[in-house]
């Protein structure tokens, strides 16, 4: 890599199933990985020798299912006991364990059992995306804008930011995926003048968002947002997988539920069938020797696939209704419905949405897999002063808090301080008081959600305001100040008005939240893993080079024409050097140095033997 640091910030769409990276240098460029793919699987695999990330990890998943990790985005910022985590664990081949109610992933790596947090797995994917960008730019990348689902809560946003820090990135901003896609749409095809209401429908591999924006000139104002952080292509695959499992059991009497490898192979076939059914009405699925020597073969029609997923497809319209209701806008006032995310390629999803908007033509002008990274790269250029075009220079993003924020009051009633869909950054205040006489300490539990009963919402953290003057209940005036920054991350301060005593919390003690020490430790660990990966790659390369050189020397020695060029008395020396090099190659744990020395030694013997006779 060339010296120097990239002055801008890359845009990374950190997806559940695939990730994408873009840069801005005079214009946006989506960067392909070393396989030439513009999206990279969000997979990390661990083997006895190495760690693989991206395509290489996904390609070996069926052979190594228990140590191939994916779906980290479905774990990040969540508690172990959450319903979605427990149900996902039933479908994952890798092991998830409970560590103080935070989920950890357990794998075998370099011959040892190791555990990783979802943040660490995500950081490995982010590192991969950073390296893909660096290979193209030729400079070191230090800054990034990373996207998250609009409906991610505070804990999930903070955990994503931590993943960036572990990857050695300064995450300038966490932005919402549909908002990033809106930028890509707004900047495309000279659409930036007309004032319009745009609905972004973003259905990806694991998450679903709907955002309603008002775009006027370069000002993008999010009016409302809704979604489901646990709905996407993976769920459609799972339903199809269950259908195929039942078919296989009917035909053979065999149940593959306990076999991780068979499940992985069948899931891959289900995913392929799902994609094929977006363009044809019927497809055949074949998996040789799926389980116990039995082959699997089945025909699936698009109609059957739609039937299997009917309830999930239909559920995508609920957030659409919600955003219209929240923004107080009639569906007839929506100028464009923009499709984002790979799962919007499914014809039934498109039909339901078009029918909902009275047969409206859906907007498909942007690439559903790349739009989010595109928008993130534009935002990265703006934040680092690298944007050159007039239309990006004046671009302004006004996003919203996706869920209400507030405190738990007496009787577990949720006291909303920041209503959902409030434009961020924002500062909101609300006054509270004591519930008992002479109360000197007041606990402020901070929640996020839409339910009146606090237990139904997400507890983000809590803190105590001490030193409240002892007064009769109801007399002290306690003010809660909620500050939400542009990343959607919250800081809460409580002040007792008569004394000015205050206490505050940046929501950092939520379950699974990493301390700065833990992040630092993980950064160092990530460096070690990177060094181990590089050492393995060098050793692999040295082994391959030695192998290929041995092979070419063997050809020379056995070829009558070529061997005639070797000095008469030197042939034995070449053969001895060849035998020595071959024996080094046979040593499984031969070091990179030993392999290189063997190659140099053999080259020396050949050069001497071939020098003018």
Swiss-Prot record:
Residues 1-391 are annotated as: Nucleotide binding domain (NBD). A motif (Nuclear export signal) lies at residues 574-582. Residues 392-402 are annotated as: Inter-domain linker. PROSITE patterns: HSP70_1, HSP70_2, HSP70_3. ATP binds at residues 16-18, 73, 205-207, 271-278, 342. Transmembrane segments: none annotated. Keywords: ATP-binding, Chaperone, Cytoplasm, Hydrolase, Nucleotide-binding, Protein biosynthesis. It catalyses: ATP + H2O = ADP + phosphate + H(+). It is an enzyme of class 3 (hydrolase). It is found in: Cytoplasm. Residues 403-613 are annotated as: Substrate binding domain (SBD). Residues 516-612 are annotated as: Lid domain (SBDalpha). One of its GO terms (biological process) is translation. One of its GO terms (molecular function) is ATP-dependent protein folding chaperone. GO terms for cellular component: cytoplasm. Pfam families: HSP70. Its EC number is 3.6.4.10. Binds to ribosomes. Binds close to the ribosomal tunnel exit via contacts with both ribosomal proteins and rRNA. Directly interacts with nascent polypeptides. This interaction is dependent on the ribosome-associated complex (RAC). Interacts with SSE1. Interacts with FES1. NCBIfam families: PRK00290.1 (NF001413). Belongs to the heat shock protein 70 family. Ssb-type Hsp70 subfamily. Ribosome-bound, Hsp70-type chaperone that assists in the cotranslational folding of newly synthesized proteins in the cytosol. Stimulates folding by interacting with nascent chains, binding to short, largely hydrophobic sequences exposed by unfolded proteins, thereby stabilizing longer, more slowly translated, and aggregation-prone nascent polypeptides and domains that cannot fold stably until fully synthesized. The Hsp70-protein substrate interaction depends on ATP-binding and on allosteric regulation between the NBD and the SBD. This is Ribosome-associated molecular chaperone SSB1. It comes from Kluyveromyces lactis (strain ATCC 8585 / CBS 2359 / DSM 70799 / NBRC 1267 / NRRL Y-1140 / WM37). The gene is SSB1.
